């Protein structure tokens, strides 16, 4: 059985993440999804809690044809220990899927197979762009799965982000 690992902050979870996970599901028997920086929320760069991000992922992936686990992972401030920390928080996995150079380097140094999936429309499908659109009152809903729109509305996420940023 092969188990893949994919980590992100998911602030918010968007169509680019969805595309990558759908591709991973075609090759892995199971997927472990790490919600990174789980301890951070209520900032402009990280407005959503780990629990809210777990909800976004779980609802968006209901129809994924691959079993998955969504696991919040808090940051450690020592990169040399990070892989061991991740491994202590997750089921065992064979392959890491990431385009983040640091994540790729750390897992490669630990002897883990690392695959770099093609990014999906990276210029428009990024958490930074989506949060900027929310702050500017621009349409953002088309950049995330419908379940994420529902979660963000349910938690009044746009209003939270605007209050945190000091705008209305």
Curated annotation (Swiss-Prot):
Pathway noted in the entry: Cofactor biosynthesis; NAD(+) biosynthesis; NAD(+) from nicotinamide D-ribonucleotide: step 1/1
Record-listed E.C. numbers: 2.7.7.1
UniProt xrefs under Pfam families: CTP_transf_like
Localization per Swiss-Prot or TrEMBL:
Cytoplasm
Give the matching Gene3D superfamilies.
Answer: HUPs
What are the alphabetically sorted keywords of the record? ATP-binding, Cytoplasm, NAD, Nucleotide-binding, Nucleotidyltransferase, Pyridine nucleotide biosynthesis, Transferase
Where is it mainly found? Answer: cytoplasm
Concerning InterPro entries, the annotation shows:
Cyt_trans-like, NMN_Atrans_arc, Rossmann-like_a/b/a_fold
The UniProt GO MF terms for this protein read: ATP binding; nicotinamide-nucleotide adenylyltransferase activity
Per the record, the coiled-coil ranges are none
Q: Can you supply one Gene Ontology CC term for this chain's record?
A: cytoplasm
What is the catalytic activity of this protein? beta-nicotinamide D-ribonucleotide + ATP + H(+) = diphosphate + NAD(+)
Query: What's a single GO BP term from this record?
Result: NAD biosynthetic process
- Cytoplasm as a keyword of this entry, yes or no, is yes
> PANTHER family, alphabetically?
BIFUNCTIONAL NMN ADENYLYLTRANSFERASE_NUDIX HYDROLASE, PHOSPHOPANTETHEINE ADENYLYLTRANSFERASE
Name the family: Belongs to the archaeal NMN adenylyltransferase family.
Name assigned to this protein: Nicotinamide-nucleotide adenylyltransferase
Q: From what organism does this protein derive?
A: Methanoculleus marisnigri (strain ATCC 35101 / DSM 1498 / JR1)
């Amino acid at each position: 059985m092969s188990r893949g690992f994919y980590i992100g902050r998911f602030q918010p979870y968007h169509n680019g993440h969805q595309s990558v996970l759908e591709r991973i599901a075609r090759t892995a028997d199971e997927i472990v999804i790490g919600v990174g920086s789980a301890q951070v929320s209520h900032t402009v760069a990280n407005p959503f809690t780990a629990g809210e991000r777990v909800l976004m992922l779980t609802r968006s992936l209901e129809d994924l044809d691959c079993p998955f686990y969504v696991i919040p992972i808090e940051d450690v401030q020592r990169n040399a220990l990070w892989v061991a920390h991740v491994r202590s928080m997750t089921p065992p996995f064979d392959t890491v899927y990431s385009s983040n150079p640091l994540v790729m380097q750390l897992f490669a140094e630990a002897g883990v197979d690392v695959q770099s999936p093609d990014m999906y429309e990276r210029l428009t499908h990024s958490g930074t762009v989506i949060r900027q659109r929310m702050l500017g009152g621009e349409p953002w809903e088309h950049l995330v799965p419908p379940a994420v729109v529902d979660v963000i509305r349910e938690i009044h996420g746009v209003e939270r982000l605007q209050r945190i940023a000091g705008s209305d």
